[in-house]
Curated annotation (Swiss-Prot):
Disulfide bonds join C48-C62, C55-C66, C61-C71. InterPro entries: Conotoxin. It comes from Conus textile. Pfam families: Conotoxin. This is Conotoxin Gla(3)-TxVI. Residues 1-19 form the signal peptide. The modification 4-hydroxyproline is found at P49, P54.
């Protein structure tokens, strides 16, 4: 009987430890997922080069403006 009680206590401790660990995981997963770029953002990066690249129209620079042939912030 004592062995059963000890076994149940150990199981309860392990389950509570697992619950605490699982509560922390979603936050880490959210951080990881928020850093990932969507396919649309990746495509936009390919179409719109670095802001130091030359441009002739504002839309070529994505969210930047085109001034004197270069993207400005």
């Amino acid at each position: 009987m004592q062995k059963l009680i000890i076994l149940l206590l150990v199981a309860a401790v392990l389950m509570s430890a697992q619950a605490v660990l699982q509560e922390k995981r979603p936050k880490e997963k959210i951080k990881f997922l928020s850093k990932r770029k969507t396919d649309a953002e990746k495509q936009q990066k390919r179409l719109c080069p670095d802001y130091t690249e030359p441009c002739s129209h504002a839309h070529e620079c994505c969210s930047w403006n085109c001034y004197n042939g270069h993207c400005t912030g």
